[in-house]
Amino acid sequence: MTELARLKFYATQPHSCSYLPEEQATTLFLDPSQPMDVHVYADLSEMGFRRSGDHLYRPHCQNCNACVPARIPVAQFNPNRQQKRIFKRNVDLQVRPVKPAFSEEYFDLYQRYIEQRHADGDMYPPSRDQFSTFLVRDLPFSRFYEFRLDGRLLAVAVTDLLPNGLSAVYTFYEPQEERRSLGRYAILWQIAEAQRLGLEAVYLGYWIKNCKKMNYKTQYRPIELLINQRWVVLN
């Protein structure tokens, strides 16, 4: 473990929660002046932190603990029948890792995805500045995994390569390709990639029991949740 005790953290003022509208949220951020070190990031991921743009953060709410960090221990992952079908359905896709960058091709796909899948969320309406600030960061451990079919871009999985696993930062995909279940496939592919690289886990961010948009995360078993500062398997 790195010497986390020397790091500084700052808490935001309470603000409206984007997942549970009736709640007020507070977020704990690593000091922005702290260099984005991959080993610090890995240690903080074990403590439930995530990356958004140039910031590492985790929920720090006074009256709510609904946001539970979730990860998949990839060595024990056992795909179910539906997941095997999804993997087989997308075997014709070509996957390529590239350095994060802005392009109109990426933004057009991101824009269609947000407008058709998340028009009720706080990322709507999408903008080029929002896309760049959120996802296009010059970090040596960050990748855009492109999923293409005969050159056509169908999905991008923004992923951080950490010493202890892959952190699934964000995935956006072609909303018209519903049959392919591209969001689910991107997670399955990242699990397989983590296995290939000999890594321990894929970090999925936060799971919220009463948030329907989060339900998909518990379809990957086994899944571990960070509860009382310990990773435990969800039964």
From Swiss-Prot:
GO terms for cellular component: cytoplasm. One of its GO terms (molecular function) is arginyl-tRNA--protein transferase activity. It comes from the Bacteria. Keywords: Acyltransferase, Cytoplasm, Transferase. It catalyses: N-terminal L-glutamyl-[protein] + L-leucyl-tRNA(Leu) = N-terminal L-leucyl-L-glutamyl-[protein] + tRNA(Leu) + H(+); N-terminal L-aspartyl-[protein] + L-leucyl-tRNA(Leu) = N-terminal L-leucyl-L-aspartyl-[protein] + tRNA(Leu) + H(+). Pfam families: ATE_C, ATE_N. Its EC number is 2.3.2.29. One of its GO terms (biological process) is ubiquitin-dependent protein catabolic process via the N-end rule pathway. Functions in the N-end rule pathway of protein degradation where it conjugates Leu from its aminoacyl-tRNA to the N-termini of proteins containing an N-terminal aspartate or glutamate. HAMAP family: Bpt (MF_00689). PANTHER family: ARGININE-TRNA-PROTEIN TRANSFERASE 1 (PTHR21367), ARGINYL-TRNA--PROTEIN TRANSFERASE 1 (PTHR21367:SF1). This is Aspartate/glutamate leucyltransferase. The lineage of its organism: Bacteria, Pseudomonadati, Pseudomonadota, Gammaproteobacteria, Pseudomonadales.
